[in-house]
Amino acid sequence: LETPGEEVDNRSLEEILSSIPPPPPPAMASEAGAPRLMITHIVNQNFKSCAGEKILGPFHKRFSCIIGPNGSGKSNVIDSMLFVFGYRAQKIRSKKLSVLIHNSDEHKDIQSCTVEVHFQKIIDKEGDDYEVIPNSNFCVSRTAYRDNTSVYHISGKKRTFKDVGNLLRSHGIDLDHNRFLILQGEVEQIAMMKPKGQTEHDEGMLEYLEDIIGCGRLNEPIKVLCRRVEILNENRGEKLNRVKMVEKEKDAVEGEKNIAIEFLTLEKEMFKKKNHVCQYYIYDLQKRIDEMKTQKEKIHEDTKEITEKSNMLSNEMKAKNSAVKDIEKKLHKATKFIEENKEKFRQLDLEDVQVREKLKHATSKAKKLEKQLQKDKEKVEELKSIPAKSKTIINETTTKSSSLEKEKEKEEKKLKEVMDSLKQETQGLQKEKEDQEKELMGFNKSVNEARSKMEVAQSELDIYLSRHNTAVSQLSKAKETLITASETLKERKAAIGEINTKLPQTQQELKEKEKELQKLTQEEINLKSLVHDLFQKVEEAKSSLAMNRSRGKVLDAIIQEKKSGRIPGIYGRLGDLGAIDEKYDIAISSCCHALDYIVVDSIDTAQECVNFLKRHNIGVATFIGLDKMTVWAKKMAKIQTPENTPRLFDLVKAKNEEIRQAFYFALRDTLVADNLDQATRVAYQKDRRWRVVTLQGQIIEQSGTMTGGGSKVMRGRMGSSVIVEISEEEVNKMESQLQKHSKQARRIQEQKVQHEERVVKLRHSEREMRNTLEKFAASIQGLSDQEEYLTVQIKELEANVLTTAPDKKKQKLLEENVSAFKKEYDAVAEKAGKVEAEVKRLHDTIIEINNRKLKAQQNKLDMINKQLDECASAITKAQVAIKTADRNLIKAQDSVVRTEKEIKDTEKETNDLKAELKAIEDKAEEVIKKTNAAEESLPEIQKEHRNLLQELKVIQENEHALQKDALSIKLKLEQIDGHIAEHNSKIKYWQKEISKIKLHPIEDNPVETVSVLSPEDLEAIKNPDSITNQIAILEAQCHEMKPNLGAIAEYKKKEELYLQRVAELDKITSERDNFRQAYEDLRKQRLNEFMAGFYIITNKLKENYQMLTLGGDAELELVDSLDPFSEGIMFSVRPPKKSWKKIFNLSGGEKTLSSLALVFALHHYKPTPLYFMDEIDAALDFKNVSIVAFYIYEQTKNAQFIIISLRNNMFEISDRLIGIYKTYNITKSVAVNPKEIASKGLC
């Protein structure tokens, strides 16, 4: 339902809707007389080019211009305001804050700078007058220090940047989008934004307008609600499927439930009768047991005399056994002494071998060390000769390097002479080039003047024709829009009709293809399962055939005799007649040598096989006769083992019970352990020793000896499945069947892929048709309204074209004036072009002369430098060789000393080993003497032991005679006990049968208990067989029914689950509908808010651009007219007398005018009290500068504009001039009121 890592907003609908903020209120009213914010003055203290305290202002309430020469510090005024408003140092054209502190020759080591911006709220009055709102004055300041830290103050109190930002935003200063701020070169970028941001964090025209209009606050809630609706739809679909599935399962079980209830009714009657019969049998058996117990008490009286005689013989037996134990201890002690001495001798023998090996190794080592000493001495002599050779190389190379240095000085002098000669050669060409460049500068001045006259004449003509051209353009555009709307309306109505026809057909075909795809999928699963099983069988058959072929010649000959029928009783090799898990392969291969024995039916068959092998001289083999294996049948039962370790025999799977007996003969009670530690624990138990093998093939015998292990282990002597005799023809037949089904599976898979592709296409087509149908149906009404509106608008525009028609005579006069100026411009431009071409030719000639003569001499000098580098490298290598030889000589001498020491140590070791060998030989001689003495005294002890055993045998024979009599009596008792036990067993059986009887509840009826009959009732039963017959009839009826008793509980469970699933579906459906309605309402609210603001802004933009360009046109277009948020907003402009263009294709001046028109339109929609603009008129000609200046002065009377400008058309119209000038590296300012000066006649 949700992608991994996705965070889903799980808030309730009420919480999501309540978290949406209300539409932002306007920062200030656009009506006259409304209060607004203005800057009174700015105080700079040691900020950038200002030293000490400098006051800028006072600023006018409407239009102030900052003027001054380049480099005087005009832009620092903007920087000071940016500094206070919290911008980073890089935005203020500095790398860090400390750079903002003033630094000049007169003022050094200043530790801080401060900027204060003073604000007040006013109400405009007539002219330049205004009323200050009481207590509205406040001052925001920021101080930066040398350590790049800064602090903020509001009206003298220390505050954080967040407090400053909140205060300025509350008064309408847009710090988030910087609409109040247009820096140098940034005016064009406003209108050049992309229609829509390309990424989540990118901002395009759509996002820019959304933030201003205020509907951007709805974006996140819409996304949250959309995602929640998607998740709820997916959850609801899942719940609906579950309801349908449970309902289907419930209906399917109902029939079986009814049969089960009928069955339980019959079973209840049968159990009641069975209960009566079982109680009768228990009662009858108990009577017989009581009679046998009386008989048993009489026999016990006859056993007392035999018991007394047995006790006497038992005491005598104990005495003799004690004597036997004493003599056995003495015998054991003598035997143990002999064994210990033999073991000592074996140990000494082993030590003797080890010492002799060490002695041999020491002798060999001494010879090797002698050879190594000789090599080390030769190496010392070689290293002593290296320094002399290296010094000879250094002397020769140093001499060669000195001669090359002298040659280098000569070549460098030659290079300098060549360079001096080139300078004199090109002197005349340089003079001629400078004269031509001076002439070109004069021509350029004439070209600029001619171009200016031509553009002024063209502007006058454009202004005169602008109203008529605008009217004609609007009429043409309205007609084109009407045609487009009518055609679109007609096309969409036709498309709706076509979709309504095709959609049902597509849906029907999709259902059919989905059914066929489901059928093919099931068929593919079945075929793949069949192919997989066949493949395994073929592989097993091939493996069996290969194993049969790889048998030895003896086994092969015996099997051949079996197949021919000459010796019919042969089964085969024992390992091939059984199977074991691959985990135990190594264990059984290591511990069971009998796996290669050949199994036959009898000893006679085995003898026939032996005779056959001898007769044909094939070899020998060991045989197992199954007729002799029956003795092991009783021991094959499961046994209790230490730590429940598995018995290897129990893990073997054999063909039949007879073969299992042969495997027990081969394995007996051998256990298999995981590792050697467990095997050791299991093998040595107190009461018994076990034969144990590990999974790694290590074996512990019952005697305690351990074998196996090592790097090579035995494996593969027994397979994981019983080998079946199979012919090559059968294998071929199975392979043919496998190929047939594999081919069929591939064909089904290809059909499935084709159907899947078709289903995907049909689903996509159905979805596309549904989306298109919804989209077209929604747009029909809008297109109809647009068609009616445009018909009325065209009539109005046709009347407007007639009223704005120009005077033909005046138009012709202006056009002739433009043509005359153009001819004058073309003539001057042609002369300037010829002079410019001559300057380029002279420049190229000078460059070519320099390159030709300088190259050869430079190559000679480079070759000498290369040889000097090679000499230096050779000297360095020789010096390194001298140093290395000294170090290596010390190492070689150390090696000689070390080798001589090792030779001495080896001689000492050899002597020590010879002495040790002599000591071992002496100890061995003493051990042999002690062993011989003990063996001489052993026969006398053994004779005494045999006499005691003979006496013990006589006592045992007497005891056996008594035991025979006791056994006869015991057998009688056991016979009686056997009958009693048998009757008790039958009683337990019938009691168990009664305990099994449980009367099941039928539907909601209470559970009945089983009745207990009294002795009188049981005696009254004369014929239990008739009840048994009735039970048999009822059992037959029940057996024929074959009900599913679980169907009752399953039906109840399904019914409960069905009701639960329906309740869950209703709940999630209601929740989904609420979220979907809220989602649609928010989308409509966002669209309505955006389009209301958008129409106001685009209409004002059109009006502003027409006014600024005197006839041009501009508008904000929806890229997708049906959904403004899908593709964004495109800014299109039609400059005067030009076609419609995208903003990116305009000239610099046209982009500036377009951007300013948009800025003033946004100001009209959402007024901002302050605007700071830095040289926004840089790309405009004098006419457009005047138009922009008059517009600012006349149309924006409800805001304060502070503009940096160098164009007199701009600053002469302003209400207040702030002059900036710099003397002695310090910026100063002066405020002038132009109107006041003009009124006094001072200008």
From Swiss-Prot:
Principal location: nucleus
SMART domains, A to Z: SMC_hinge
Keyword Glycosyltransferase applies: no
Residue positions, PTM N6-acetyllysine: K336, K634
Domain remark in the UniProt entry: The SMC hinge domain, which separates the large intramolecular coiled coil regions, allows the heterodimerization with SMC2, forming a V-shaped heterodimer.
Stretches assigned to coiled coil: 225-546, 721-975, 1062-1090
SUPFAM superfamilies in UniProt: P-loop containing nucleoside triphosphate hydrolases (SSF52540), Smc hinge domain (SSF75553), Tropomyosin (SSF57997)
Known function: Central component of the condensin complex, a complex required for conversion of interphase chromatin into mitotic-like condense chromosomes. The condensin complex probably introduces positive supercoils into relaxed DNA in the presence of type I topoisomerases and converts nicked DNA into positive knotted forms in the presence of type II topoisomerases.
Gene: SMC4
GO cellular component: condensin complex; cytoplasm; nuclear lumen
Pfam family, one: SMC_N
Domain SMC hinge per the UniProt entry, residue ranges: 568-682
Subcellular locations according to the entry: Nucleus; Cytoplasm; Chromosome
Gene3D superfamilies noted in UniProt: 1.20.1060.20, 3.30.70.1620, P-loop containing nucleotide triphosphate hydrolases
Similarity comment: Belongs to the SMC family. SMC4 subfamily.
Annotated positions binding ATP: G68, P69, N70, G71, S72, G73, K74, S75
Protein name from the UniProt record: Structural maintenance of chromosomes protein 4
Native source species: Microtus arvalis (Common vole)
Chain segments carrying region Disordered: 1-30
Molecular-function annotations in GO: ATP binding; ATP hydrolysis activity
Statement: the UniProt record of this protein carries the keyword Plastid: no
PANTHER family: STRUCTURAL MAINTENANCE OF CHROMOSOMES PROTEIN, STRUCTURAL MAINTENANCE OF CHROMOSOMES SMC FAMILY MEMBER
Matches recorded under InterPro entries: P-loop_NTPase (IPR027417), RecF/RecN/SMC_N (IPR003395), SMC (IPR024704), SMC_hinge (IPR010935), SMC_hinge_sf (IPR036277)
Known partners and oligomeric status: Forms a heterodimer with SMC2. Component of the condensin complex, which contains the SMC2 and SMC4 heterodimer, and three non SMC subunits that probably regulate the complex: BRRN1/CAPH, CNAP1/CAPD2 and CAPG.
GO BP terms in the entry: cell division; meiotic cell cycle; mitotic chromosome condensation
Assigned keywords, A-Z: Acetylation, ATP-binding, Cell cycle, Cell division, Chromosome, Coiled coil, Cytoplasm, DNA condensation, Mitosis, Nucleotide-binding, Nucleus, Phosphoprotein
